[in-house]
Amino acid sequence: MANIAVSHIDHPNLPAPSGTGTFIALFFSAWLALVFFLGARGAFVAQRGAPPLALLLGLLGPLTLFLLAYFTIRPVREFILSADLRLIVGMQAWRWAGLGFLTLYTYRILPGIFAWPAGLGDMAVGITAIPVLASLLRKPGFAGGKRFVAWNLLGILDLTVAVSIGALVPILAPNLYGAVTTAPMSQLPLVLIPVFLVPTFLMLHLTALFQSRRLAS
């Protein structure tokens, strides 16, 4: 099994069909441009106490398309299964920038009930991405193990908790935030986090899990 993993990571045996990578790059570019356009028009802003439906749609829409494409479009599935796991894990290291949530809390831009779990969770995933990447480089078969799966599941849990707090607290306890709310997360530039970066990081975790499952089978 380790030999299979080495072959897959160092010399992928599922080369993506020609043009698939270009198509996916264009999709991400168009998605990012759409987020900027809608964000500039205030399309993601919700009334105080109302559910942030536009934000949730912006998060779940691309994620749903990703899953549908994986399970129904073979070239996309092959592209995902041939992606370099080292790059995928390395990109998660950027989540150490969750420190920014704590900075925004310090300046009373975001509430602590959201900023602390979101910030610390992202920082934990970003920092631990380094030893996970080191394990992959040292032993490619690590990708098919339980610890690799657990790390990705924890990364997904962190994002899920942050999104849940941001979405549910304004509905269930609209006065809990006080004067400082999560409203800035629905406006540029912070809106890029829930409707672009969060789904992108979730896609990376899912890609890693799909590959891990294949390697372990």
Language-model features, listed with the residues they occupy:
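Hydrophobic alpha-helical membrane-insertion segments
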Residues: 147-164
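Short, membrane-exposed interhelical loops at transmembrane-helix boundaries
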Residues: 172-192
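N-terminal membrane topogenic signal
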Residues: 12-28
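A glycine-rich, hydrophobic loop/mini-helix early in the fold
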Residues: 46-110
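Membrane-interface helix-boundary motifs at transmembrane edges
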Residues: 13-17, 45-48, 74-85, 138-147, ...
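Membrane-proximal helix-loop-helix units in multi-pass membrane proteins
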Residues: 90-148
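Hydrophobic cores of alpha-helical transmembrane segments in multi-pass inner/ER membrane proteins
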Residues: 58-70, 124-133, 192-210
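Alpha-helical transmembrane segments of multi-pass membrane proteins
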Residues: 28-43
